[in-house]
A protein has these predicted regions:
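Conserved small/polar residues in nucleotide/adenosyl-binding loops
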Residues: 384-388
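Right-handed parallel beta-helix/beta-spiral solenoid domain characteristic of secreted/periplasmic
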Residues: 48-63, 70-78, 82-117, 149-206
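Short glycine/acidic-rich loop motifs that flank beta-strands on beta-rich extracellular proteins
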Residues: 36, 56-59, 138-140, 154, ...
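N-terminal extracellular ligand-recognition/capping segment immediately after the signal peptide
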Residues: 9-13, 23-59, 116-167, 191
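Solenoidal tandem-repeat scaffolds enriched in leucines and small polar residues
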Residues: 246-247, 265-267, 271-274, 278-295, ...
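Short "repeat-start/strand-capping" segments in structured domains, especially the N-termini
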Residues: 41-43, 144-146, 182, 213-216, ...
Length: 388
């Protein structure tokens, strides 16, 4: 426990001078205006918000700072947080999120306040819980870090970017700065992209991107109307004898609907499990598959043992329907320099393909078991190295 308890006020004394003790508990009972200044919190301090206490109008730099508060606004929407922060649970209401987004019945944006700054602030914490609402984001590419849990509380996140290549949430890639990111859980929210509103045609605006990381669980999510994929997994970061593959990813009870390119794409990964997911209504730009397992067509001949592959992917109890392309497309590439297939060990069990199909080629060891494949005029089952 902190040896010192300091009450912070908007007194004549500068705010920074009131934050001058490491490992102290600072009690904030009233509105603190930082007057557009940068204020650094001493190392290991605790900010305890009580009554109507909140901080506004400036930049607050944490230093292993813990926040304690009831479910009230404690950081106004004109606060920028930097540095390192923690809380037992960080609630979205702390950060002045505005749940005023209005969309029509198809998900098209009508109006709403931008919550991009609030999202950047809350993502500095590890354990996030959103109050159920409909939130609008004008910007995107929100970076997630290791050891993070995001519980959306059944909220809707509506994002609207004018860029041709972006994603709503990104794991493992901060605009080219690669970093292995591990132990992440995302659950209980819906992402709605701007496929219906935008006249900018692209295939690279994804709901969630897992570029590089391990031990990642997505559960009870919906990702739809993105101008790329609902979920993208993969990268082309190559080094000899170093594995940069996203790995050990579980996708459970998720729905990928009405996306522009694919419901989900895997271009590089090892150990991915889809359980109880739906891939539906993909339409826009080829391949337009429900799920596409397809390495990018790049030259890996200069690298030894670069681990560029799609391997050990399991699809169980999933549903594929009404995709303009294949239900499941597995498109292998040529063998690597060691003569090995780079798409290996694909297992499909107890799944339904309604007005869809499975197309697979250029791979080794694919097993399809106990599936219903209800094809239409487009449907077929074509394969290479497939055991059914």
């Amino acid at each position: 426990s902190q040896a010192n308890i300091v009450f912070v006020t908007n007194s004549i004394q500068p705010i920074q001078k009131q934050f001058n003790l490491s490992y102290a508990k600072y009690v904030i009972k009233s509105n603190i205006n930082l007057m557009s200044q940068n204020v650094v919190i001493p190392e290991g301090a605790v900010l305890c918000f009580v009554d109507s206490g909140r901080i506004e109008n400036g930049t607050l730099i944490g230093n292993g700072t813990k926040v304690m508060a009831q479910q009230n606004v404690v950081f106004s929407d004109n606060i920028l947080l930097k540095g390192s922060w923690k809380a037992d649970t960080a609630y979205s209401i702390w950060f002045d999120f505005k749940s005023d987004c209005i969309v029509d019945s198809s998900g098209r944006f009508i109006s709403g306040s931008d919550n991009s700054q609030q999202m950047n602030n809350i993502l500095l914490f590890d354990n996030l819980l959103f109050n159920c609402g409909v939130y609008y984001f004008k910007h995107a590419n929100f970076q997630l870090h290791s050891d993070m849990i995001i519980d959306g509380g059944n909220s809707v996140f509506k994002w609207n970017t004018s860029l041709k290549a972006d994603c709503f949430m990104a794991i493992g890639d901060s605009r080219g700065k690669w970093a292995g990111t591990s132990n992440i859980q995302l659950k209980n929210f819906t992402i709605i992209g701007n496929k219906l509103e935008s006249d900018i045609k692209t295939e690279q605006c994804h709901g969630i991107c897992i570029r590089y990381g391990s031990n990642i669980i997505l559960s009870n999510l919906q990702s739809g109307f993105n101008r790329g994929d609902g979920l993208y997994i993969g990268n082309v970061y190559l080094e000899s004898n170093i594995d940069h593959s996203p790995s050990y990813i579980s996708v459970i009870n998720c729905i990928f609907s009405d996306n522009h390119r694919q419901g989900s794409s895997i271009t590089r990964a090892n150990h991915v499990d889809f359980l109880g997911c739906k891939f539906i209504n993909t339409n826009g730009t080829p391949p337009q598959a429900g799920l596409d397992i397809e390495p990018n067509d790049i030259n890996i001949s200069a690298y030894e043992n670069c681990y560029y592959a799609c391997e050990n992917i399991r699809i169980n109890n999933c549903f594929f329907s009404n995709n303009a392309g294949n239900g499941l497309l597995v498109a292998g590439r040529s063998k690597n320099r060691e003569g090995k297939y780079i798409v290996n060990n694909i297992f499909v069990n107890n799944s339904v393909f309604d007005r869809g199909n499975i197309r697979a080629f250029g791979l080794k060891n694919m097993q399809v078991k106990d599936c219903d494949i209800l094809t239409d005029s487009y449907g077929s089952v074509s394969y290479t190295h497939l055991r059914a």
